[in-house]
Amino acid sequence: MFLSVVVPVYNVERYVGDCLCSLLNQPESLCEIIVVNDGTKDNSMEIVHKLVNGYTNVRIINQENKGLSEARNAGLRHALGEYVWFVDSDDTILENAVEYLHDIVDTYPCDVYASNLLIKNEKTNEQYLEFAEFFSGYLPTEQYGEKYNGTTSQRYIFRKKFLIDNNLFFMPGV
């Protein structure tokens, strides 16, 4: 399995359908989708179950509410993919995104990949590209720190072994 996409779910009935639809349109042979039910109290999981019915590449993990970080960590622990992508339930990904990532990984093998984000303001419907300068290949750490300040996890695709071997998990309670 190339990629595990971890989607934490907690009271996101307004968004989770769009998120899952964008993920379910990716090739089943390349990715698994791990939905982590973090004890949601709304109808999010009913929406999830309805959408994922019949898909063999979707797994659902149920846990009591422990917060976003612990939900992501649970997904990481269950991930079967060589790479892991943490996608929040109010995010959508572009069509062919997983195939594109697969091609990039084949061309430029490394432990962490960073991507652009298209941010949409819900109130104004304005959109802007964060991380607008595109690069491909390798970027030394010191140059990355000078140019980019990207702290959102959905921007990064990680080699699972890199995270596990270095004991890199999300900090509980954050």
Predicted segment positions?
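Cell-envelope/extracellular polymer assembly enzymes that use nucleotide-activated donors
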Residues: 2-4, 22, 32
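Short, well-formed alpha-helical segments that are part of the catalytic scaffolds
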Residues: 12-25, 47
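A conserved acidic beta->alpha catalytic loop
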Residues: 22, 37-46
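Acidic donor-binding/catalytic loop of UDP-sugar-dependent glycosyltransferases
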Residues: 43, 91-104
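Glycine-rich, basic loop-to-helix element that forms the pyrophosphate-binding segment
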Residues: 63-79
